[in-house]
Amino acid sequence: MACEKPVKVRDPTTGKEVELVPIKVWQLAPKGRKGVKIGLFKSPETGKYFRAKVPDDYPICS
């Protein structure tokens, strides 16, 4: 299942806030705890990849 919804994230390479569609989203949680969802994004300006937190209601996709 591909990710489709854009998410507003801060690009750490440029420092700007951009709206991007994540390449992949996965759950990151310690044992027995709720955890957070992390998304893999590609910076449109520099081409570097970075990870950022996505909303909890975002579906897990790869």
Curated annotation (Swiss-Prot):
Methylated at multiple sites, to varying extents. InterPro entries: Cren7_sf, dsDNA-bd_Cren7. Transmembrane segments: none annotated. Its main location: cytoplasm. It comes from the Archaea. Keywords: Chromosome, Cytoplasm, DNA-binding, Methylation. The keyword Magnesium does not apply. GO terms for cellular component: chromosome; cytoplasm. Belongs to the Cren7 family. A chromatin protein, binds double-stranded DNA without sequence specificity. Constrains negative DNA supercoils. This is Chromatin protein Cren7 1.
